[in-house]
Amino acid sequence: TEEALQDINTASELADLIELRLDYINNIKVSDIETLIKAKARPVIATCRPKREGGRFTGSEDKRVALLERATDSGAEYVDIEHDVERSLINKFRKKAGTKIIVSYHNFSETPADAELKEIHQKLAGTGADVVKIVAFARNITDNLRIFSFLEGVRTPTIAFCMGELGQISRILAPKYGSFLSFASLEKGKESAPGQLSAKELLNVYNFRRINRATDIYGLIGNPVAHSMGPLLHNTCLREEGLNAVYLPFKVEDLPSFINGFKTLNVRGYSVTIPHKVTIMGLLDKLDPLVESIGAVNTVVNRDGKLVGYNTDSTAAVKVIEDGLAKDGDTLHGKKVTIVGAGGAARAVAFGLKQKGAGITIVNRTESRAETLAGDLKCQYKKFGELDKLNTAILINCTSIGMHPNIDDIPVPANVLRPGMLVFDAVYNPPETRLLREAAVRGCRTLDGVKMFVLQAAQQFELWTGRPAPLEHLERIVRTKLAGTQ
Ligand code: NAP
């Protein structure tokens, strides 16, 4: 009870309503309830969820009803009652003046089909509920679409969303589709259902209070997406530019059905990450010419319903290097560039630099991949073992060597680094890799991967909105976040 009192206090600073989960309070006594309800500075929903509906209450039904009754008698504005209780219990609470009834249905294994959702809603609304609550579980990201279209068709105040990581977007978009409320945890680790975001994340990352029916949607397509910095960066840009839009994480397994299904939401733009950068090309209406040569898309723009693919990894890397050279009045044209790596990042960087007239050499551990990329670029390639004879003006690391946690690894022998060489590392975690440290000691100019990472996001934002992104602010966010993960 003591801990609950503290939590009520904290919750009052974040939330519009507080759900008091009586089933989460150990050994709760009926007499404690009045103390808890009286402490509220916000309207309260009293819930005492039994195990059968996914809660923790294992006591008798009489005790459960007694706890809820004491809560409503003490002034709880809402009481949440499960759909499968005796109708007489619902009627009992309906007679209590000043208390509204939420009749709830939970499905922890799937999202019911459209017709079934309507049927459940009709049944719950028929009990005389003030608010109907239908909570499903998302097995696929497209399950959220059923919830959105269902919400748009109901008249009774209704709470509806999907649980689970794949259902998080339905919690964030609750105000857009008219859900009566959305639940958030008090802090990370205090979730009362799978997929719940913390209140601070909902408010500070997703700008929840700004979301309404007219809010545009952007998002990141990938798998996994849970640790991406994209939502923080893009939602910061959207807020600072005063745009009515939100950027969401889309964890996508089946890409074709996602792209097709989400057309109904008219998503304004996507970032694309592993593992979908190549496969998405075949699902778009148009590709930027640079994308056709690189063979990968990291950005999609919705232009009047047509999806157009771009690659800002490429343009961002080129800009970072050009800006680095420009400090000494230099340009890329005719420069000798060695790229270590032949994966997705190397392809994007190499094609961008080639367009600017650089002379490129590819070096990669798996020689056949170096040969293929060099063939596509019509440039030279070398064996990994030949790196000790390096003769280049610009050296770029596009491998994951040196990336957290293997921070002592270096992609080239340190003695090949010469004064005046420009060394760019695409790795951004950590920002200062061993390669960059050794390069600085030997008098090279250095550029880190954070600049590219921030710029590729900023260029996406510009492609979507036509507005410049707040670059310095974004760079600060990324560097602070990365400093916290070391
Ligand atoms: P990828 O497609 O998987 O390619 C990985 C590359 O690293 C391949 O060339 C691979 O060589 C090489 N590699 C990996 N481990 C190695 C090792 N132990 N020894 C030698 N070579 C090794 O990955 P990617 O998407 O190109 O990403 C590469 C790096 O760039 C990652 O660290 C990523 O974080 C970074 N990146 C940064 C940005 C940014 O905005 N700053 C953007 C994109 C990527 P093999 O061909 O022999 O396997």
What are these regions (language model features)?
Residues 1-115, 129, 136:
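Active-site beta->alpha loop and helix N-cap motifs at the rims of alpha/beta catalytic domains
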Residues 18, 356-377:
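NAD(P)-binding Rossmann-fold cofactor-contacting core
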Residues 37, 44-90, 279-332:
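Glycine/small-residue-rich loop that forms an oxyanion/phosphate-binding "nest" at active or ligand-binding sites
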Residues 84-216:
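Catalytic alpha/beta core domains of metabolic enzymes, predominantly
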Residues 162, 218-225, 309-314, 321, ...:
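Glycine-rich adenosine-cofactor-binding loop
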Residues 215-327:
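Phosphate/diphosphate ligand-binding glycine-rich loop within oxidoreductases
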Residues 330, 334, 419-422, 426-486:
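Adenosine-phosphate binding glycine-rich loop
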Residues 375-446:
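Rossmann-like adenosine-cofactor binding region
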